[in-house]
Amino acid sequence: MLTTPQHYAYIKIAEGCNNFCAFCIIPHLRGRYRSRAVEDILQEARGLAESGVKELIVVAQDTSRYGTDLYGAPRLPLLLHELCRIEGFHWIRVHYLYPDMITDELLDTFASEPKLVNYMDIPIQHVNDAILRRMNRRGTRAELDEMLQKLRSRLPDAVIRTSLITGLPGEGEAEFEELCAWLRENKLERVGAFVFSPEDGTPAAKMEHADEEVAQRRAEIIAELQSRIMDEYNAARVGTVMEVLCEGEEPETGRCFGRTYADSPDIDGRVLFSAARSVSPGEFVMVRITGAEDGDLVGEMEENA
């Protein structure tokens, strides 16, 4: 049963997690990673398309690991190609791609499939190598930087979302400043800042970590930095024409609102736009961006859209 507006829906392709990050309880609660069979996923997806879903959002604790347990190797590219063949979907969005599993094959898949939106949700958490090792995160900062450079080169219009955690065990002022400097350099388009919260039963809960007040202040600094980065991103959109998925109308202003490919439901921004005709939720229209307002884009629907 759909629990989202009819024009978009989530499809879970796997359950559980094998990553065992030191701060996360999920593998202990949900068990080992278990992929669904390709045909099982496709059957559900076809039903969603037939019901009128226009945007399919692919999720799992780690979508990039899909298929490793069932087929002996990652099969996310294959699955995405098959999903793109289903008639009815206009956008297919993928969440939770782990940095070390973003391969050339996966990037080629995004580049070659028009339905796949270039929105990369990549849980990074931190970039200091010592903290990454302590938190049992795979990969290093150098490997992350190399992957991001390749991603930006292969998908120039990619929007990258991530979450960063402040106050992790081992994070002092130097490690925090390294994180800030990295964010200023890489200018990720979408970032959520969270304060480390020890989870009972995890290794990190037993480790010494930053004072909660200090961690909260650091999260606020990250949020302020990201706000400036997002303002730059929005300013660069002014004057362009973007495809927008309409989601409704503001009763108080009469303006329509919707999302671009750069915005996932509930967690990212919106586009507020005026329209000379009635626009239905779930309809795709072209909008000329004229400005920004409190983090959201503002525009006017193209008359021939």
Model feature map: region roles:
Residues 54, 90, 189, 283, ...:
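Short acidic/polar active-site loop segments enriched in Thr and Asp
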